[in-house]
Amino acid sequence: MEEDRGSALAAESALEKNVAELTVMDVYDIASLVGHEFERVIDQHGCEAIARLIPKVVRVLEILEVLVSRHHVAPELDELRLELDRLRLERMDRIEKERKHQKELELVEDVWRGEAQDLLSQIAQLQEENKQLMTNLSHKDVSFSEEEFQKHEGMSERERQVMKKLKEVVDKQRDEIRAKDRELGLKNEDVEALQQQQTRLMKINHDLRHRVTVVEAQGKALIEQKVELEADLQTKEQEMGSLRAELGKLRERLQGELNQNGEEEPVAELGGEECVSEAEKVAMDLKDPNRPRFTLQELRDVLHERNELKSKVFLLQEELAYYKSEEIEEENQIPQPPPIAHPRMSPQPESGIKRLFSFFSRDKKRLANTQRNVRIHETFGQWANCHRDDGYTEQGQEALQHL
């Protein structure tokens, strides 16, 4: 009863939650609450009143379960996709900046080459003029005046200044080109580091998706086991209640028939024998080697430990398969970029909601069996009334006890 109250409170709290905060367990709590309401309706009006409604409700709850599971997986995938898109945009921006920088370097080199070509042409022209002057000086025996000598010295000084300026410009441009090359190397190193970070993030994303699928499979398996155990427990309790009710009716009917026949003493003897047989049965149960030796809580603890061990074994198997696949890929040595793993919709197993609502079909079978047993008891009572004067034989009493 306390577990039922706890599940009912959990289902009511799940109904009061916000839609964005719902989990798969909340959906199953809601399904449990709906199942209890169906039980009440069946107890009052029978199974035929809601026989056509149950499949539709089950389908709606399954759709809600799928949507909630997608909603919990979608935010993490969206964040990873946004991070990947941001890294791609940064990479594209850096590539674009490198292209612009390369174009600027090419333009600077073209300008430098043009200026160098002009200066070289000027140098060649000056050298030609110098040669002509030297030839003219060799052919002429005219002595230069001091003014002409100073003029010639000024021309040579001007050439030296031009050459010095050209050398300074060339050295400066060479230093700029070296600095640009260094910056380009640093940019390339940054791009390689970003690519390595991108591959690492994609690998982490793949591992996280793998773990999410494993955890979802474990959760679904545990939820299905819980639902099956709850359904079995409910059916067993209902069967025990029906059997107790039938046993009480049979005892009342037997006592009434014996009182009508005026055989009160055999009834007392029969009651004494039943008490003795029950005491012997208790003694035999205490001596029985197959009697239960565990409490319900201990059994639950053992089942819980078994489920944890199963989940650990499942995780280890998944990790072993994953590492084996990585070793096979490394042996093949095929350098391929890690693919972007898009989430694929795996074939959905049988939902736990169907298992939760499957006990209604068992209730129908149980009601049919109880009706058949009641008919048998009625026919047996009619036969006993017809043969009231003859008394009960030993075979009839054994059959009555068996029933």
Curated annotation (Swiss-Prot):
* Residues bearing the modification Phosphoserine: 7
Protein keywords? Cell projection, Cilium, Coiled coil, Cytoplasm, Cytoskeleton, Phosphoprotein, Protein transport, S-nitrosylation, Transport
Domain spans labelled RH1? 10-97
Record keywords: Protein transport included? Answer: yes
Keyword Methyltransferase in record = no
Q: Which residues carry this modification: S-nitrosocysteine?
A: 47
Q: Which GO terms describe its biological process?
A: cilium assembly; epithelial cell morphogenesis; nitric oxide mediated signal transduction; protein transport from ciliary membrane to plasma membrane
**Coiled-coil portions:** 76-265
What PROSITE patterns does the database record attribute to this sequence?
A: RH1, RH2
Query: What does UniProt give as GO cellular component?
Result: centriole; centrosome; ciliary basal body; cilium; cytoplasm; cytosol; membrane
- What Gene Ontology molecular function terms does this protein carry? dynein light intermediate chain binding; protein dimerization activity; small GTPase binding
Q: Which residues form the RH2 domain?
A: 291-356
Q: Which family does it belong to?
A: Belongs to the RILPL family.
The record's subunit annotation is: Interacts (when S-nitrosylated) with GAPDH. Interacts with RAB8A; interaction is dependent on the phosphorylation of 'Thr-72' of RAB8A. Interacts with RAB10 and RAB12; the interaction is dependent on the phosphorylation of 'Thr-73' of RAB10, and 'Ser-105' of RAB12.
Q: What does this protein do?
A: Plays a role in the regulation of cell shape and polarity. Plays a role in cellular protein transport, including protein transport away from primary cilia. Neuroprotective protein, which acts by sequestring GAPDH in the cytosol and prevent the apoptotic function of GAPDH in the nucleus. Competes with SIAH1 for binding GAPDH. Does not regulate lysosomal morphology and distribution. Binds to RAB10 following LRRK2-mediated RAB10 phosphorylation which leads to inhibition of ciliogenesis.
Q: What is this protein called?
A: RILP-like protein 1
